[in-house]
A protein has these predicted regions:
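Active-site neighborhoods and metal-handling regions in enzymes and metal-associated proteins
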Residues: 1-362
């Protein structure tokens, strides 16, 4: 990414800060720092003002910051980052500076207000998250690539998914393939692989439990490329499955298809969630669908906006969302089907190519 690419983002943030009567912002969330200047390390603070953007880190990241940081003056020091701001006189008395309260602990705020005691501090939670909701061309390209890697890995893993194979073997193979086809940091999140009773646990951690006959199997996983995430879920039945297990699969698939058909720019997230929720409720499984329909993707696996029954968000073009209804019935098993989509003016573009047809494993 070019210097100009990140400077555009910084300029947009400065304009938004000005509307809040703020002279700048202290950014401590590492994902937000990456979004604003490109740094991928694990310790940094970004100070953005109208006059200058300063990137603060320590001696471990001299080479990395020289290579990665765009549109900011790099300051290397071993003392706490807030103290660097004071030491370098980067702010003047009575300036009003924003910070994100979701990413500053109580102790951190006490330290910040003590070190910068003559600065007016204001919590402006969510300002960068809202900027990041709509994806630009480069971001969409990265997400498309992450989804393609996910599809490729699933295609290679599926032939080894058989009765008698352990959950963790499948999860480990997916992780290996993401690194084979992607970059060095290629797992979007720890894969969820649940079979039998474990399939009814939405966030199950893979174990040495083996796939058995007459069961449901859920595989939820995704690759990451250039920092951007993919997230896909497919569900399967094994030989000897019951009529109810097949029925649950069909209900979830239909709920997902109908939800995606309802998506377009300016639709409320709550209304899209209700399409799937109402369909599943009418099929008699209301109490077994107990999570939101989906969430946004980007430099984090879970971002706003979200499809949920309490969401107040409205969809805009180039939002990237997951659509993932599920039914989880103890003693019967669970089904979740998930795709990543791009919101368009008149609909949704489904990125995943992996089949959603009912498949039986033997």
């Amino acid at each position: 990414m070019s210097v100009e690419y990140f400077q555009r983002r910084q300029h947009i943030l400065i304009e938004k800060l000005a509307k809040e009567n703020l002279d700048g912002m202290i950014v401590t969330n590492l994902t937000h720092i990456r979004y604003l200047c490109g740094f991928t390390g694990s310790s940094a603070t970004l100070l953005i003002t109208v006059d200058q953007v300063h990137f603060i880190t320590d001696g471990r990241y001299v080479v990395q910051s020289e290579k990665e940081v765009k549109g900011a003056k790099v300051l290397i020091d071993s003392i706490p980052h807030y103290e660097v701001i004071q030491k370098q006189n980067l702010l003047t008395s009575s300036q009003s500076i924003g910070f994100d309260g979701n990413n500053v602990s109580h102790q951190g705020y006490q330290q910040l207000s003590k070190v910068l005691s003559d600065i007016n501090l204001k919590n402006i939670t969510g300002i960068i998250e809202k900027m990041a909701m709509s994806k630009d061309k480069k971001e969409l390209e990265a997400i498309r690539t992450a989804v393609e890697i996910t599809d490729t890995a699933f295609a290679e893993v599926l032939p080894m998914v058989k009765i008698g194979v352990e959950e963790k073997v499948i999860a480990n193979q997916l992780s290996f393939l993401y690194r084979k086809y992607g970059d060095s940091d290629s797992d979007a999140f720890a894969a969820i692989v649940g079979t039998g009773p474990n399939s009814a646990k939405p966030h199950h951690k893979p174990t040495d439990r083996k796939i058995g006959p007459g069961e449901l199997l859920v595989i939820d996983s995704g690759a990451k490329f250039a920092g951007y995430h993919a997230d896909m879920t497919r569900s399967f039945a094994t030989k000897g499955y019951s009529d109810e297990q097949k029925s649950i699969y069909d209900i979830v698939l239909n709920a997902q298809v109908k939800s995606i058909e309802g998506i377009k720019s300016r639709m409320s997230c709550k209304s899209i969630d209700s399409i799937a929720r109402d369909y599943i409720a009418n099929a008699g499984y209301s109490k077994f669908f107990d999570h939101g329909l989906g969430h946004s993707l980007g430099l984090e696996i879970h971002q706003d906006p979200r499809f949920s029954k309490v969401s107040e968000d409205v969809l805009e073009e180039n939002y990237v969302m997951t659509v993932e209804p599920g039914i989880y019935v103890p003693d019967i098993g669970g089904v979740r089907i998930e795709d990543d989509i791009i919101v368009t003016k008149n609909g949704a573009e489904i990125l995943n190519k992996t089949s959603k047809e009912f498949q039986v494993i033997s």
